[in-house]
């Protein structure tokens, strides 16, 4: 990517495992304006996790694009026990988007990343409802056998989501998973394919 001229911005999160969140972009089609991180509030029962990355930039035809990149708290300990942590992320994100819309009501917004939740789970539903975003990836699939973004014990699932403001959804014809053949491998135990790891 570096040889192709791509650049990146990255958080410096307090994540206990040292994991950060980044956005890779081409400066030929996205002129960076600003980037900041939103740290999730800490609590005694939640270890330090990844920040939400906010990036703004001007795209080639002159509109400003506002991108939030998410890597939500994991499901360690089980979905139900860890759900409150992802709800904290959802509330933090919604507050950030509300603040942006106070300044720019018609902002072009993309929220993308690993939500560690499915499209129908509480945190994703809250974000879509409260921040008035549409999940364009809820029914995405690939062209070479991928039915979602990961496969575990033969079952497909998508914890990765792409959410858009309504002014951008009108521009989207479809959303699909990039499952180029070199990104897949044979699932020898359950049949079919799975993402190469």
Locate the predicted segments by residue.
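N-terminal, active-site-proximal structural segment of metallo-dependent hydrolase catalytic domains
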Residues: 1-21, 90-91, 106-108, 186-194
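Short catalytic/ligand-binding loop motif for oxyanion handling, primarily in non-cytosolic enzymes
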Residues: 18, 75-76, 118-121
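A short secondary-structure junction signal
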Residues: 34-36, 77-82, 123
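Metal-dependent phosphoester-hydrolase catalytic domains
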Residues: 47, 56, 98-109, 117-197
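Active-site glycine-centered loops adjacent to acidic/histidine catalytic or metal-binding residues
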Residues: 71, 113-114
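A long, amphipathic alpha-helix that forms part
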Residues: 80-105
């Amino acid at each position: 990517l570096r040889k192709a001229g791509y650049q990146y911005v990255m958080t410096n999160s307090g994540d206990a495992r040292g994991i950060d969140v980044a956005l890779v972009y081409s400066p030929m089609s996205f002129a960076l304006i600003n980037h900041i991180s939103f740290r999730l509030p800490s609590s005694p029962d939640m270890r330090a996790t990844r920040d939400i990355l906010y990036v703004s930039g001007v795209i080639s035809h002159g509109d400003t694009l506002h991108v939030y990149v998410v890597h939500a708290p994991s499901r360690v300990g089980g979905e139900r026990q860890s759900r409150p942590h992802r709800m904290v992320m959802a509330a933090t994100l919604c507050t950030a988007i509300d603040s942006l819309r106070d300044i720019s009501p018609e902002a072009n917004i993309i929220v993308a990343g690993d939500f560690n939740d499915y499209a129908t789970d509480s945190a994703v539903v809250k974000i879509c409802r409260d921040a008035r975003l549409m999940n364009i990836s809820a029914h995405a699939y690939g062209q070479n056998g991928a039915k979602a973004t990961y496969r575990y014990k033969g079952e497909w699932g998508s914890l990765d989501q792409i959410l858009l403001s309504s002014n951008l959804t009108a521009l989207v014809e479809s959303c699909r998973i990039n499952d180029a053949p070199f990104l897949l491998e044979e699932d020898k135990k359950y049949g079919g394919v799975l993402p190469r790891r």
